[in-house]
Amino acid sequence: MRNILPFLTRIPVKGDFEKARNELWAFPLVALVSSALPTLILYLGLPLSNLLAVLALYWTIGLLHLDGLADWADGIMAKGDRERKIEVMKDVNTGIAGLFAVVIVLLLQVYSLQLLPFYALFLAELNSKYAMLLALATKRPLGKGLGAYFMEGMNGRQLALGTLLYVLLGLSVVLFEPRALAGILGLLFGVHIIRISLKNFDGLNGDCLGATAEITRAGTLVVMALVWWYL
């Protein structure tokens, strides 16, 4: 797992670029690391803990995926054919669609956490990382960036092992709180983003992976917040 950490977090560990794509199965395990500090903040019940937890999350994982979400949203909302949408997505300038998407995702996370137990963010991060693994499993690269490099290393064995880890980590919470099972519905957000990306861009790049991660996490928290509110 050490080799994949530098690509998914800001934790200062040395990873081997060549070996990283052979550790894609460890994506779900990364959720344990990326959610550790935010979960501790929520567990301690500090003032404004929901806001502090989200800040701690992005301090841990960085803003790369959030930036990808902004670029992805600009591309999706652009009018024109596939080439035009890809051109807009790759533009370094952020448009109103990208800004709107980032603000909404951040607000959904902050406000949903107010209604949820301390371990909710871990489940949301688990879904987020697994959704990225599913995106890589499509093996439909757009361009020749990091996403394409990881897709080359993706295979059935890595997906199967990653899925097993996802299930085991999820069960560790579900057995304690059955309502947490509803969190699996958050994966549908990720699957939908993957489908939209393939339809509009005919492939997936790093921006699409970032959007998948961010929207899956926010969607999972919203679903769980609704379940906790009504049940």
From Swiss-Prot:
One of its GO terms (molecular function) is adenosylcobinamide-GDP ribazoletransferase activity. It catalyses: alpha-ribazole + adenosylcob(III)inamide-GDP = adenosylcob(III)alamin + GMP + H(+); alpha-ribazole 5'-phosphate + adenosylcob(III)inamide-GDP = adenosylcob(III)alamin 5'-phosphate + GMP + H(+). It is found in: Cell membrane. It is a multi-pass membrane protein. The keyword Membrane applies. It is an enzyme of class 2 (transferase). Pathway: Cofactor biosynthesis; adenosylcobalamin biosynthesis; adenosylcobalamin from cob(II)yrinate a,c-diamide: step 7/7. The chain crosses the membrane at residues 24-44, 46-66, 96-116, 159-176, 181-198, 209-229. One of its GO terms (biological process) is cobalamin biosynthetic process. InterPro entries: CobS. The keyword Transmembrane applies. Its EC number is 2.7.8.26. Its cofactor is Mg(2+). Keywords: Cell membrane, Cobalamin biosynthesis, Magnesium, Membrane, Transferase, Transmembrane, Transmembrane helix. PANTHER family: ADENOSYLCOBINAMIDE-GDP RIBAZOLETRANSFERASE. Belongs to the CobS family. Joins adenosylcobinamide-GDP and alpha-ribazole to generate adenosylcobalamin (Ado-cobalamin). Also synthesizes adenosylcobalamin 5'-phosphate from adenosylcobinamide-GDP and alpha-ribazole 5'-phosphate. This is Adenosylcobinamide-GDP ribazoletransferase. It comes from Thermococcus kodakarensis (strain ATCC BAA-918 / JCM 12380 / KOD1). The lineage of its organism: Archaea, Methanobacteriati, Methanobacteriota, Thermococci, Thermococcales.
